[in-house]
A protein has these predicted regions:
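Sec-dependent N-terminal signal peptides
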Residues: 3-13, 18
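A generic structural signal for short, solvent-exposed coil/turn residues
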Residues: 6, 19, 155, 366-367
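Short amphipathic alpha-helical surface micro-motifs
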Residues: 20-21, 143-147, 354-357
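N-terminal non-catalytic accessory region
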Residues: 28-198, 204-257, 292, 296, ...
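Generic structural signal of hydrophobic/aromatic residues within well-ordered alpha-helices
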Residues: 68, 78-82, 253, 257, ...
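Alpha/beta-hydrolase fold catalytic core
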Residues: 159-166, 170-173, 295-390
Protein backbone atom coordinates (compact mmCIF):
# COMPACT_ATOMS: atom_id res chain seq x y z
CA UNK A 1 0.00 0.00 0.00
CA UNK A 2 2.85 2.36 0.94
CA UNK A 3 4.62 1.64 -2.38
CA UNK A 4 1.47 2.45 -4.35
CA UNK A 5 1.03 5.72 -2.47
CA UNK A 6 4.69 6.63 -3.00
CA UNK A 7 4.42 5.83 -6.72
CA UNK A 8 1.33 8.00 -7.02
CA UNK A 9 3.01 10.93 -5.28
CA UNK A 10 6.12 10.64 -7.46
CA UNK A 11 3.97 10.54 -10.61
CA UNK A 12 2.04 13.61 -9.46
CA UNK A 13 5.25 15.52 -8.75
CA UNK A 14 6.65 14.60 -12.17
CA UNK A 15 3.43 15.64 -13.92
CA UNK A 16 3.40 18.98 -12.09
CA UNK A 17 7.08 19.55 -12.91
CA UNK A 18 6.55 18.83 -16.60
CA UNK A 19 3.52 21.14 -16.71
CA UNK A 20 5.42 23.94 -14.98
CA UNK A 21 8.42 23.46 -17.26
CA UNK A 22 6.16 23.59 -20.33
CA UNK A 23 4.42 26.76 -19.16
CA UNK A 24 7.72 28.38 -18.29
CA UNK A 25 9.16 27.45 -21.68
CA UNK A 26 6.12 28.92 -23.46
CA UNK A 27 6.37 32.16 -21.48
CA UNK A 28 10.13 32.29 -22.04
CA UNK A 29 9.64 31.85 -25.78
CA UNK A 30 7.07 34.66 -25.77
CA UNK A 31 9.46 36.95 -23.91
CA UNK A 32 11.95 36.65 -26.76
CA UNK A 33 9.61 38.88 -28.74
CA UNK A 34 9.65 42.59 -28.04
CA UNK A 35 6.09 42.80 -29.33
CA UNK A 36 3.59 44.09 -26.80
CA UNK A 37 0.47 41.90 -26.88
CA UNK A 38 -2.67 43.67 -28.07
CA UNK A 39 -6.11 43.08 -26.56
CA UNK A 40 -8.99 44.31 -28.72
CA UNK A 41 -12.25 45.13 -26.90
CA UNK A 42 -15.06 45.37 -29.50
CA UNK A 43 -18.38 47.17 -29.49
CA UNK A 44 -22.08 46.31 -29.70
CA UNK A 45 -22.92 43.59 -32.20
CA UNK A 46 -19.39 42.28 -32.56
CA UNK A 47 -20.39 39.03 -30.86
CA UNK A 48 -23.75 37.54 -31.80
CA UNK A 49 -26.13 36.48 -29.04
CA UNK A 50 -27.62 32.99 -28.91
CA UNK A 51 -29.98 31.04 -26.73
CA UNK A 52 -28.22 28.06 -25.13
CA UNK A 53 -24.83 29.01 -26.62
CA UNK A 54 -22.26 26.25 -27.20
CA UNK A 55 -24.84 23.49 -26.78
CA UNK A 56 -26.72 21.31 -29.24
CA UNK A 57 -29.71 23.60 -28.63
CA UNK A 58 -27.92 26.80 -29.68
CA UNK A 59 -30.20 29.07 -31.68
CA UNK A 60 -31.44 32.59 -32.20
CA UNK A 61 -32.53 34.35 -28.99
CA UNK A 62 -35.40 35.95 -30.90
CA UNK A 63 -37.82 33.60 -32.58
CA UNK A 64 -39.94 34.85 -35.45
CA UNK A 65 -42.75 32.32 -35.24
CA UNK A 66 -46.52 31.96 -35.17
CA UNK A 67 -46.72 33.99 -31.94
CA UNK A 68 -45.54 37.09 -33.77
CA UNK A 69 -47.54 36.43 -36.93
CA UNK A 70 -50.69 35.72 -34.93
CA UNK A 71 -50.26 38.97 -33.01
CA UNK A 72 -49.90 40.89 -36.27
CA UNK A 73 -53.00 39.19 -37.63
CA UNK A 74 -55.11 39.47 -34.47
CA UNK A 75 -54.37 43.16 -33.89
CA UNK A 76 -54.85 44.19 -37.55
CA UNK A 77 -51.87 46.49 -37.06
CA UNK A 78 -50.94 46.26 -40.74
CA UNK A 79 -54.22 47.89 -41.68
CA UNK A 80 -53.57 50.64 -39.15
CA UNK A 81 -50.17 51.32 -40.71
CA UNK A 82 -51.70 51.61 -44.16
CA UNK A 83 -54.31 54.03 -42.83
CA UNK A 84 -51.63 56.11 -41.12
CA UNK A 85 -49.61 56.33 -44.34
CA UNK A 86 -52.73 57.40 -46.20
CA UNK A 87 -53.37 60.16 -43.65
CA UNK A 88 -56.41 58.54 -42.01
CA UNK A 89 -57.02 58.91 -38.28
CA UNK A 90 -55.74 56.14 -35.98
CA UNK A 91 -56.07 56.41 -32.21
CA UNK A 92 -52.50 56.57 -30.77
CA UNK A 93 -53.22 54.71 -27.52
CA UNK A 94 -54.98 51.92 -29.38
CA UNK A 95 -52.01 51.65 -31.73
CA UNK A 96 -49.61 51.54 -28.76
CA UNK A 97 -51.58 48.65 -27.26
CA UNK A 98 -51.37 46.79 -30.56
CA UNK A 99 -47.66 47.51 -30.90
CA UNK A 100 -47.14 46.17 -27.39
CA UNK A 101 -48.88 42.92 -28.31
CA UNK A 102 -46.90 42.53 -31.54
CA UNK A 103 -43.51 43.15 -29.89
CA UNK A 104 -44.14 40.91 -26.87
CA UNK A 105 -42.37 37.96 -28.49
CA UNK A 106 -39.29 40.13 -29.17
CA UNK A 107 -38.51 40.94 -25.53
CA UNK A 108 -36.15 38.07 -24.82
CA UNK A 109 -33.02 40.23 -25.12
CA UNK A 110 -34.16 42.52 -22.31
CA UNK A 111 -32.73 41.93 -18.85
CA UNK A 112 -34.47 41.62 -15.49
CA UNK A 113 -34.86 44.50 -13.02
CA UNK A 114 -31.37 43.82 -11.70
CA UNK A 115 -29.81 44.15 -15.13
CA UNK A 116 -29.09 40.44 -15.44
CA UNK A 117 -29.70 38.25 -18.47
CA UNK A 118 -32.97 36.32 -18.47
CA UNK A 119 -32.83 32.75 -19.72
CA UNK A 120 -29.88 31.03 -21.28
CA UNK A 121 -28.71 33.79 -23.62
CA UNK A 122 -25.08 34.65 -24.28
CA UNK A 123 -22.22 34.51 -26.77
CA UNK A 124 -20.56 31.43 -28.23
CA UNK A 125 -17.12 32.93 -28.88
CA UNK A 126 -15.38 33.72 -25.60
CA UNK A 127 -11.86 33.01 -26.79
CA UNK A 128 -9.06 33.01 -24.23
CA UNK A 129 -6.39 32.14 -26.81
CA UNK A 130 -4.85 34.42 -29.43
CA UNK A 131 -6.32 35.16 -32.85
CA UNK A 132 -3.72 32.83 -34.36
CA UNK A 133 -6.30 30.15 -33.56
CA UNK A 134 -9.21 32.14 -35.02
CA UNK A 135 -7.95 33.33 -38.39
CA UNK A 136 -11.36 32.86 -39.99
CA UNK A 137 -12.63 35.73 -37.83
CA UNK A 138 -10.22 38.12 -39.54
CA UNK A 139 -11.92 37.50 -42.89
CA UNK A 140 -15.48 37.50 -41.56
CA UNK A 141 -15.90 41.18 -42.51
CA UNK A 142 -13.76 43.66 -44.41
CA UNK A 143 -14.60 46.42 -41.95
CA UNK A 144 -15.32 47.13 -38.27
CA UNK A 145 -13.60 45.05 -35.58
CA UNK A 146 -12.47 42.17 -37.85
CA UNK A 147 -10.69 44.68 -40.11
CA UNK A 148 -9.09 46.37 -37.10
CA UNK A 149 -7.90 43.02 -35.77
CA UNK A 150 -6.62 41.97 -39.18
CA UNK A 151 -4.37 44.99 -39.71
CA UNK A 152 -2.99 44.62 -36.18
CA UNK A 153 -2.30 40.94 -36.88
CA UNK A 154 -0.60 41.93 -40.14
CA UNK A 155 1.65 44.29 -38.19
CA UNK A 156 2.66 42.12 -35.24
CA UNK A 157 1.39 38.59 -35.92
CA UNK A 158 -1.91 37.01 -34.91
CA UNK A 159 -0.15 35.13 -32.11
CA UNK A 160 0.24 38.49 -30.36
CA UNK A 161 -3.38 39.63 -30.65
CA UNK A 162 -6.33 38.67 -28.42
CA UNK A 163 -10.01 39.54 -28.80
CA UNK A 164 -12.10 40.03 -25.66
CA UNK A 165 -15.65 39.11 -26.65
CA UNK A 166 -18.53 39.75 -24.26
CA UNK A 167 -22.31 40.01 -24.04
CA UNK A 168 -22.87 43.63 -25.07
CA UNK A 169 -26.05 43.94 -22.98
CA UNK A 170 -24.36 43.51 -19.63
CA UNK A 171 -23.00 46.13 -17.23
CA UNK A 172 -19.67 47.40 -18.58
CA UNK A 173 -18.18 47.38 -15.08
CA UNK A 174 -18.84 43.66 -14.75
CA UNK A 175 -17.35 43.27 -18.23
CA UNK A 176 -14.30 45.18 -16.99
CA UNK A 177 -13.88 42.75 -14.09
CA UNK A 178 -13.94 39.87 -16.57
CA UNK A 179 -11.50 41.78 -18.78
CA UNK A 180 -9.12 41.98 -15.81
CA UNK A 181 -9.06 38.18 -15.58
CA UNK A 182 -8.66 37.97 -19.35
CA UNK A 183 -5.66 40.33 -19.35
CA UNK A 184 -4.05 38.39 -16.51
CA UNK A 185 -4.26 35.28 -18.68
CA UNK A 186 -2.88 37.15 -21.72
CA UNK A 187 0.10 38.28 -19.66
CA UNK A 188 0.82 34.69 -18.67
CA UNK A 189 0.45 33.41 -22.23
CA UNK A 190 2.57 36.17 -23.75
CA UNK A 191 5.20 36.42 -21.06
CA UNK A 192 4.75 40.20 -20.97
CA UNK A 193 3.62 42.31 -18.03
CA UNK A 194 1.91 45.00 -20.12
CA UNK A 195 -0.64 45.02 -22.95
CA UNK A 196 -1.94 47.46 -25.50
CA UNK A 197 -5.71 47.97 -25.26
CA UNK A 198 -7.56 48.81 -28.48
CA UNK A 199 -11.23 49.46 -27.80
CA UNK A 200 -14.08 50.25 -30.16
CA UNK A 201 -17.46 51.90 -29.62
CA UNK A 202 -19.05 50.40 -26.46
CA UNK A 203 -15.75 48.64 -25.80
CA UNK A 204 -14.26 52.02 -24.87
CA UNK A 205 -16.69 52.13 -21.94
CA UNK A 206 -15.51 48.68 -20.83
CA UNK A 207 -11.90 49.86 -21.00
CA UNK A 208 -12.80 53.08 -19.16
CA UNK A 209 -14.21 50.96 -16.34
CA UNK A 210 -11.14 48.71 -16.43
CA UNK A 211 -8.83 51.69 -16.09
CA UNK A 212 -10.87 53.06 -13.19
CA UNK A 213 -10.78 49.79 -11.26
CA UNK A 214 -7.42 48.32 -12.22
CA UNK A 215 -5.04 51.14 -13.14
CA UNK A 216 -2.94 50.30 -10.07
CA UNK A 217 -1.90 47.05 -11.81
CA UNK A 218 0.23 49.15 -14.19
CA UNK A 219 -0.31 46.65 -17.00
CA UNK A 220 -1.29 49.03 -19.83
CA UNK A 221 1.38 50.20 -22.26
CA UNK A 222 -0.96 52.11 -24.53
CA UNK A 223 -4.69 52.47 -25.02
CA UNK A 224 -6.38 53.37 -28.30
CA UNK A 225 -10.03 54.46 -28.31
CA UNK A 226 -11.90 54.11 -31.63
CA UNK A 227 -15.26 55.85 -32.17
CA UNK A 228 -15.76 55.74 -28.43
CA UNK A 229 -19.00 55.58 -26.47
CA UNK A 230 -17.13 56.24 -23.22
CA UNK A 231 -18.79 59.66 -22.87
CA UNK A 232 -22.12 58.51 -24.28
CA UNK A 233 -24.10 59.42 -27.36
CA UNK A 234 -27.00 61.80 -27.90
CA UNK A 235 -29.14 58.77 -28.78
CA UNK A 236 -28.96 58.10 -25.03
CA UNK A 237 -31.20 61.13 -24.60
CA UNK A 238 -34.08 58.79 -25.43
CA UNK A 239 -33.92 57.84 -21.74
CA UNK A 240 -35.03 61.42 -21.07
CA UNK A 241 -38.12 60.72 -23.19
CA UNK A 242 -36.61 63.08 -25.74
CA UNK A 243 -38.07 61.71 -28.93
CA UNK A 244 -38.22 64.53 -31.46
CA UNK A 245 -39.27 63.69 -35.00
CA UNK A 246 -39.15 66.49 -37.52
CA UNK A 247 -39.77 65.93 -41.23
CA UNK A 248 -37.30 68.63 -42.26
CA UNK A 249 -34.61 67.09 -40.03
CA UNK A 250 -35.24 63.66 -41.56
CA UNK A 251 -35.05 65.06 -45.09
CA UNK A 252 -31.86 66.99 -44.23
CA UNK A 253 -30.40 63.82 -42.74
CA UNK A 254 -31.07 61.81 -45.90
CA UNK A 255 -29.84 64.65 -48.15
CA UNK A 256 -26.60 65.04 -46.20
CA UNK A 257 -25.91 61.33 -46.21
CA UNK A 258 -26.63 61.08 -49.92
CA UNK A 259 -24.08 63.85 -50.48
CA UNK A 260 -21.26 62.74 -48.17
CA UNK A 261 -21.64 59.01 -47.37
CA UNK A 262 -18.87 57.16 -49.24
CA UNK A 263 -19.13 53.51 -48.15
CA UNK A 264 -21.34 51.12 -50.10
CA UNK A 265 -23.13 49.61 -47.09
CA UNK A 266 -26.25 51.75 -47.62
CA UNK A 267 -27.45 53.47 -50.80
CA UNK A 268 -28.68 56.76 -49.39
CA UNK A 269 -29.08 58.20 -52.88
CA UNK A 270 -31.82 55.67 -53.63
CA UNK A 271 -33.43 56.27 -50.24
CA UNK A 272 -33.44 59.98 -51.01
CA UNK A 273 -35.33 59.30 -54.26
CA UNK A 274 -37.86 57.08 -52.49
CA UNK A 275 -38.50 59.79 -49.88
CA UNK A 276 -39.10 62.28 -52.69
CA UNK A 277 -41.53 59.94 -54.44
CA UNK A 278 -43.56 59.28 -51.29
CA UNK A 279 -43.33 62.72 -49.75
CA UNK A 280 -46.95 62.75 -48.58
CA UNK A 281 -46.65 59.31 -47.03
CA UNK A 282 -43.56 60.36 -45.08
CA UNK A 283 -45.38 63.46 -43.84
CA UNK A 284 -48.27 61.35 -42.59
CA UNK A 285 -45.93 58.93 -40.81
CA UNK A 286 -44.00 61.77 -39.15
CA UNK A 287 -47.23 63.41 -38.02
CA UNK A 288 -48.42 60.17 -36.41
CA UNK A 289 -45.06 59.47 -34.78
CA UNK A 290 -45.23 62.91 -33.22
CA UNK A 291 -48.65 62.01 -31.84
CA UNK A 292 -47.17 58.84 -30.33
CA UNK A 293 -44.33 60.81 -28.72
CA UNK A 294 -46.52 63.67 -27.50
CA UNK A 295 -46.72 64.46 -23.80
CA UNK A 296 -50.13 62.79 -23.71
CA UNK A 297 -48.92 59.46 -25.13
CA UNK A 298 -45.19 59.11 -24.56
CA UNK A 299 -45.43 57.51 -21.11
CA UNK A 300 -47.63 54.76 -22.53
CA UNK A 301 -45.29 54.34 -25.51
CA UNK A 302 -42.36 53.84 -23.15
CA UNK A 303 -44.02 51.62 -20.55
CA UNK A 304 -45.86 49.44 -23.08
CA UNK A 305 -43.34 49.19 -25.93
CA UNK A 306 -39.88 50.71 -25.48
CA UNK A 307 -38.96 49.70 -21.93
CA UNK A 308 -40.18 46.08 -22.14
CA UNK A 309 -37.92 45.68 -25.18
CA UNK A 310 -34.70 47.20 -23.82
CA UNK A 311 -35.29 49.20 -20.64
CA UNK A 312 -33.31 46.90 -18.33
CA UNK A 313 -30.20 46.52 -20.50
CA UNK A 314 -27.42 48.14 -18.43
CA UNK A 315 -25.08 48.96 -21.32
CA UNK A 316 -27.71 51.12 -23.02
CA UNK A 317 -28.13 53.18 -19.86
CA UNK A 318 -24.35 53.46 -19.75
CA UNK A 319 -24.44 55.21 -23.14
CA UNK A 320 -26.24 58.23 -21.66
CA UNK A 321 -24.01 61.35 -21.76
CA UNK A 322 -22.72 62.26 -18.30
CA UNK A 323 -24.56 65.60 -18.12
CA UNK A 324 -27.88 64.00 -19.13
CA UNK A 325 -27.77 61.08 -16.73
CA UNK A 326 -29.32 62.59 -13.59
CA UNK A 327 -32.32 63.98 -15.45
CA UNK A 328 -32.77 60.75 -17.42
CA UNK A 329 -32.63 58.67 -14.24
CA UNK A 330 -35.16 60.92 -12.51
CA UNK A 331 -37.57 60.61 -15.43
CA UNK A 332 -37.22 56.83 -15.59
CA UNK A 333 -37.67 56.55 -11.80
CA UNK A 334 -40.92 58.51 -12.09
CA UNK A 335 -41.99 56.18 -14.88
CA UNK A 336 -41.18 53.11 -12.81
CA UNK A 337 -38.62 51.93 -15.34
CA UNK A 338 -35.98 51.47 -12.65
CA UNK A 339 -36.17 51.22 -8.87
CA UNK A 340 -33.81 52.76 -6.33
CA UNK A 341 -31.74 50.00 -4.77
CA UNK A 342 -32.30 47.51 -7.58
CA UNK A 343 -29.34 45.80 -9.19
CA UNK A 344 -29.90 47.85 -12.35
CA UNK A 345 -29.90 51.10 -10.37
CA UNK A 346 -26.66 50.18 -8.61
CA UNK A 347 -24.94 49.22 -11.85
CA UNK A 348 -25.84 52.27 -13.91
CA UNK A 349 -25.10 54.78 -11.15
CA UNK A 350 -21.75 53.09 -10.51
CA UNK A 351 -20.73 53.48 -14.15
CA UNK A 352 -22.00 57.06 -14.21
CA UNK A 353 -19.49 57.86 -11.46
CA UNK A 354 -16.73 56.11 -13.42
CA UNK A 355 -17.66 58.10 -16.52
CA UNK A 356 -17.12 61.26 -14.51
CA UNK A 357 -13.63 60.13 -13.48
CA UNK A 358 -12.37 59.34 -16.99
CA UNK A 359 -10.30 62.51 -17.43
CA UNK A 360 -8.62 62.01 -14.06
CA UNK A 361 -7.99 58.33 -14.83
CA UNK A 362 -6.45 58.96 -18.24
CA UNK A 363 -4.22 61.73 -16.90
CA UNK A 364 -3.07 59.32 -14.21
CA UNK A 365 -2.11 56.83 -16.92
CA UNK A 366 -0.24 59.47 -18.91
CA UNK A 367 1.75 60.44 -15.82
CA UNK A 368 2.91 56.82 -15.66
CA UNK A 369 4.02 56.90 -19.30
CA UNK A 370 1.00 55.20 -20.86
CA UNK A 371 0.37 56.27 -24.46
CA UNK A 372 -3.19 57.39 -25.30
CA UNK A 373 -4.87 57.84 -28.69
CA UNK A 374 -8.47 58.86 -29.40
CA UNK A 375 -9.88 58.50 -32.92
CA UNK A 376 -13.32 59.81 -33.86
CA UNK A 377 -15.39 60.50 -36.94
CA UNK A 378 -17.15 63.66 -38.08
CA UNK A 379 -18.82 65.13 -41.12
CA UNK A 380 -21.85 62.84 -40.96
CA UNK A 381 -25.16 63.84 -39.35
CA UNK A 382 -26.51 62.34 -36.16
CA UNK A 383 -29.73 60.33 -36.26
CA UNK A 384 -32.70 62.71 -36.46
CA UNK A 385 -34.57 61.70 -33.30
CA UNK A 386 -33.31 64.08 -30.61
CA UNK A 387 -32.66 67.79 -30.09
CA UNK A 388 -29.03 67.18 -31.14
CA UNK A 389 -29.86 65.87 -34.61
CA UNK A 390 -27.59 68.52 -36.14
CA UNK A 391 -24.50 67.30 -34.30
CA UNK A 392 -21.36 66.26 -36.15
CA UNK A 393 -21.07 62.48 -35.82
CA UNK A 394 -20.03 59.20 -37.40
CA UNK A 395 -23.78 58.44 -37.81
CA UNK A 396 -24.00 56.89 -34.34
CA UNK A 397 -21.75 58.62 -31.81
CA UNK A 398 -21.51 62.40 -31.69
CA UNK A 399 -18.05 63.81 -32.35
CA UNK A 400 -18.22 65.96 -29.22
CA UNK A 401 -18.53 62.79 -27.10
CA UNK A 402 -16.22 60.46 -29.04
CA UNK A 403 -13.48 63.13 -28.98
CA UNK A 404 -13.97 63.71 -25.25
CA UNK A 405 -14.90 67.35 -25.51
CA UNK A 406 -14.44 68.89 -28.96
CA UNK A 407 -16.69 71.82 -29.83
CA UNK A 408 -18.36 71.03 -33.14
CA UNK A 409 -20.41 72.94 -35.67
CA UNK A 410 -23.88 71.76 -36.58
CA UNK A 411 -23.97 69.91 -39.89
CA UNK A 412 -23.35 72.32 -42.75
CA UNK A 413 -22.18 75.14 -40.44
CA UNK A 414 -18.87 76.47 -39.08
CA UNK A 415 -17.72 76.80 -35.49
CA UNK A 416 -16.04 79.82 -33.93
CA UNK A 417 -12.33 79.43 -33.14
CA UNK A 418 -12.13 76.37 -35.36
CA UNK A 419 -8.89 74.41 -35.23
CA UNK A 420 -9.79 72.22 -38.22
CA UNK A 421 -9.14 73.67 -41.70
CA UNK A 422 -12.77 73.08 -42.73
CA UNK A 423 -14.14 75.05 -39.76
CA UNK A 424 -16.11 72.13 -38.31
CA UNK A 425 -14.05 71.35 -35.20
CA UNK A 426 -12.58 73.29 -32.29
CA UNK A 427 -10.34 70.71 -30.64
CA UNK A 428 -9.01 73.15 -28.05
CA UNK A 429 -11.86 72.09 -25.76
CA UNK A 430 -10.90 68.39 -25.94
CA UNK A 431 -9.66 66.90 -22.70
CA UNK A 432 -6.76 65.38 -24.65
CA UNK A 433 -6.35 67.63 -27.68
CA UNK A 434 -2.83 66.47 -28.49
CA UNK A 435 -3.88 62.82 -28.49
CA UNK A 436 -7.06 63.10 -30.56
CA UNK A 437 -7.51 62.55 -34.30
CA UNK A 438 -10.56 63.36 -36.44
CA UNK A 439 -11.51 61.52 -39.65
CA UNK A 440 -14.18 63.11 -41.83
CA UNK A 441 -16.77 61.04 -43.68
CA UNK A 442 -16.01 57.64 -42.16
CA UNK A 443 -19.11 55.93 -40.83
CA UNK A 444 -19.00 54.39 -37.34
CA UNK A 445 -16.23 51.73 -37.29
CA UNK A 446 -15.91 51.66 -41.10
CA UNK A 447 -12.14 51.15 -40.98
CA UNK A 448 -12.19 49.21 -44.24
CA UNK A 449 -9.37 46.70 -44.63
CA UNK A 450 -6.96 47.52 -47.43
CA UNK A 451 -7.41 51.29 -47.07
CA UNK A 452 -5.09 53.78 -45.42
CA UNK A 453 -7.90 54.51 -42.93
CA UNK A 454 -7.41 50.96 -41.69
CA UNK A 455 -3.62 51.28 -41.85
CA UNK A 456 -3.78 54.39 -39.65
CA UNK A 457 -5.64 52.51 -36.93
CA UNK A 458 -3.17 49.64 -37.16
CA UNK A 459 -0.29 52.09 -36.89
CA UNK A 460 -1.64 53.66 -33.69
CA UNK A 461 -2.04 50.23 -32.11
CA UNK A 462 1.42 48.90 -32.93
CA UNK A 463 3.89 51.73 -33.60
CA UNK A 464 6.81 52.53 -31.37
CA UNK A 465 6.31 56.25 -32.06
CA UNK A 466 4.92 58.52 -29.36
CA UNK A 467 1.15 58.85 -29.67
CA UNK A 468 0.66 62.58 -29.95
CA UNK A 469 -0.43 64.69 -32.89
CA UNK A 470 2.97 66.29 -33.47
CA UNK A 471 5.05 63.11 -33.26
CA UNK A 472 2.70 61.14 -35.49
CA UNK A 473 2.62 63.91 -38.12
CA UNK A 474 6.43 64.09 -38.13
CA UNK A 475 6.80 60.33 -38.51
CA UNK A 476 3.99 59.70 -41.01
CA UNK A 477 1.53 61.32 -43.41
CA UNK A 478 -1.17 61.23 -40.72
CA UNK A 479 -2.32 64.61 -39.42
CA UNK A 480 -4.91 65.52 -36.81
CA UNK A 481 -7.66 66.25 -39.35
CA UNK A 482 -8.15 63.82 -42.20
CA UNK A 483 -10.95 62.84 -44.54
CA UNK A 484 -11.74 60.33 -47.25
CA UNK A 485 -12.49 60.87 -50.94
CA UNK A 486 -14.92 58.95 -53.15
CA UNK A 487 -12.35 56.14 -53.50
CA UNK A 488 -12.05 55.81 -49.70
CA UNK A 489 -8.53 57.21 -49.72
CA UNK A 490 -7.71 59.26 -46.63
CA UNK A 491 -5.69 62.47 -46.75
CA UNK A 492 -5.24 65.63 -44.71
CA UNK A 493 -8.11 68.12 -44.59
CA UNK A 494 -6.94 71.36 -46.18
CA UNK A 495 -10.14 73.41 -46.33
Amino acid sequence: MFKKLLSFLLAAVMLFTVAQTGAAAYAEEAKKSDVTPVVVVPGIGSSALYSYPNTVHQGSPITIDDTLFNAVSDTHITGDLLRIMAGAKVEPKTFINKLSAVTRSLRSLNCDENGNSVGNIGIDCYWTDSLANHLDYLDSRSTAEPAVCKIICDNIGAENVWLFNYDFRMDVVEDADQLAEFISDVKIQSGHDKVTLVSASLGTSVVSAYIDRYKSRNDIKRTVFLDGAFQGTSVGKLFKKELIIDEDEINNYIDLLAACYVADTIDFGSIQKVFSMFDGTVSNLVEFLNELSSEENIDALYTEVVLPLLGNIPSLWECIPYDDFDEALEMMLELGAVKVGSGLFEKITRYHDIQGRLEENLKSLQEKGVEIAIVCGYGLPQMPFTSLAGNQSDMLIDTCYASFGATTADAGEKVENATSPDGCIDASTCKFENNTWFIKGVQHMEFVYGTNVNEFVGYLATTGDALNVKSVAEATEYTQYMGINSDYVMSSITE
